Amino acid sequence: MKTIIALSYIFCQVFAQNLPGNDNSTATLCLGHHAVPNGTLVKTITNDQIEVTNATELVQSSSTGRICDNPHRILDGKNCTLIDALLGDPHCDGFQNEKWDLFVERSKAFSNCYPYDVPDYASLRSLVASSGTLEFFNEGFNWTGVTQNGGSYACKRGPDNSFFSRLNWLYKSESTYPVLNVTMPNNDNFDKLYIWGVHHPSTDKEQTNLYVQASGRVTVSTKRSQQTIIPNVGPRPWVRGLSSRISIYWTIVKPGDVLLINSNGNLIAPRGYFKIRTGKSSIMRSDAPIGTCSSECITPNGSIPNDKPFQNVNKITYGACPKYVKQNTLKLATGMRNVPEKQTRGIFGAIAGFIENGWEGMIDGWYGFRHQNSEGTGQAADLKSTQAAIDQINGKLNRVIEKTNEKFHQIEKEFSEVEGRIQDLEKYVEDTKIDLWSYNAELLVALENQHTIDLTDSEMNKLFEKTRRQLRENAEDMGNGCFKIYHKCDNACIGSIRNGTYDHDVYRDEALNNRFQIKGVELKSGYKDWILWISFAISCFLLCVVLLGFIMWACQKGNIRCNICI
């Protein structure tokens, strides 16, 4: 029985070797491109989902969880807000004259001095934050006739009653509080920021005890502006044992201008000025820890890499950051259209070209050749067309990043309740900008993906046409990305086709002769496969009949015994 099976196998192998297409006088050369078993889906202008061999994610969706201290100078506010550090709250004395690129305010920050409010809090905070320094210069104001350096038990500096270190609380001297009229010129060539305030006592008695007059007034003027504040006497909610308040105001004095302060009571006077600097410093609210690392882009969630053009970590950023978009993912095609290779190529192992499917396992190039000739089969990459495609795709990601990365920061906006309508408008504008950028990002990526796929398809077609021009009438286009070569073409011949040195004149006569001989006996392609399968089926049927007849004859002669058990 084993002998019969072995003979049958040998018969089929011989039969297969004699099939058309296995003639040693011809060869098959196929062109193809790289493919992978599982590609990546990307979006193009014409297709929402198209599979490519490789793609790069463009949206940064996670942070490091910490704020990197390099290359930006980070100042951790710890328990202090920027305004408390500016005013000189006793527990913020460590921030005097500090500098920063980014001031990080913590949610745990608190005030620990006299209760105050800042009518234009957001503007003052933004102004000081962008200046990037708390550098302070004392000036010799002349406050004749009043007592200086007032303090409060609500503002302890050590065991002693104290006050904001950058402000001077003035109150009556003996039983008088004269009208104060003090000037301070700006003879320097930079802007000066003066912080001052108005005290609002909780009762009329407190008002007269401190300032004699039943109603005070504070006027601060420059050549460009004037502010007059009338104190509002009356009780307020208790904070740190006090129901009185201080309102904080600020004035910028330009070079050559003069600061004029006029008051008959309730003045919280400046001790000097802050030097206003122009720069790109900023402030951010975050509870992320500050770590030793390097990152150009910072968000409240922590630092993020800026090697991608988009991010959806946070709208608030500082530094050179990817553009914020709503999408969680945007994939940029960095490979060609993926057509996974078919695992079965028929019973005789035929090869196929790029029109049918891609080729898996081409690790040394994107485009290449497969051949079948008298010496067997082989595969080689075409490095020139591969490099042409890669050169055009390389740098695509960098170009997208250059178009989208912000070289500035986006700070959070703060508004008082009075500015609610402005806040709503600002939110609408920001949301609209994000919607537009999200749409633009998706469109940009889709356009780039379309270009990449068209480009890689074009390189494949260029290689195919180049090969066709070399072979001319020596080969026939089989319609699947392959050529049937009508002359004997060994591996050296195949190599000359690949490297562009093939001389079709050398093989022209042989190819024409073989073409006419093969065409003379070759059936039309519409019937060839049917005849092949029918002849194979008949051969197998006859083989089975012969085998069955032999078994029956052997049983009759007693050479084979068959036992049937029930």
Swiss-Prot record:
* Family, as annotated: Belongs to the influenza viruses hemagglutinin family.
Keyword Nucleotidyltransferase tagged = no
How is the protein modified post-translationally, according to the record?
Palmitoylated. In natural infection, inactive HA is matured into HA1 and HA2 outside the cell by one or more trypsin-like, arginine-specific endoprotease secreted by the bronchial epithelial cells. One identified protease that may be involved in this process is secreted in lungs by club cells.
Q: Name one GO cellular component term.
A: membrane
Q: What is this protein called?
A: Hemagglutinin
Source organism of this protein record: Influenza A virus (strain A/Memphis/2/1978 H3N2)
Give ranges for the Cytoplasmic compartment: 552-566
* Complex and partners: Homotrimer of disulfide-linked HA1-HA2.
Q: What is the annotated signal peptide range for this record? A: 1-16
The record's misc note reads:
Major glycoprotein, comprises over 80% of the envelope proteins present in virus particle. The extent of infection into host organism is determined by HA. Influenza viruses bud from the apical surface of polarized epithelial cells (e.g. bronchial epithelial cells) into lumen of lungs and are therefore usually pneumotropic. The reason is that HA is cleaved by tryptase clara which is restricted to lungs. However, HAs of H5 and H7 pantropic avian viruses subtypes can be cleaved by furin and subtilisin-type enzymes, allowing the virus to grow in other organs than lungs.
- Point out the glycosylated residues in this chain: N24, N38, N54, N79, N142, N181, N301, N499
**InterPro entries cross-referenced by the UniProt entry:** Capsid_hemagglutn (IPR008980), Hemagglutn_HA1_a/b_dom_sf (IPR013828), Hemagglutn_influenz_A (IPR000149), Hemagglutn_influenz_A/B (IPR001364)
Question: SUPFAM superfamilies per the record?
Answer: Influenza hemagglutinin (stalk) (SSF58064), Viral protein domain (SSF49818)
Q: Give the intrachain disulfide bonds.
A: C30-C482, C68-C293, C80-C92, C113-C155, C297-C321, C489-C493
- Provide the membrane-side ranges marked Extracellular in the record: 17-530
As for what it does, the entry says: Binds to sialic acid-containing receptors on the cell surface, bringing about the attachment of the virus particle to the cell. This attachment induces virion internalization either through clathrin-dependent endocytosis or through clathrin- and caveolin-independent pathway. Plays a major role in the determination of host range restriction and virulence. Class I viral fusion protein. Responsible for penetration of the virus into the cell cytoplasm by mediating the fusion of the membrane of the endocytosed virus particle with the endosomal membrane.
What Pfam families does the entry give? Hemagglutinin
- Cell location: Virion membrane; Host apical cell membrane
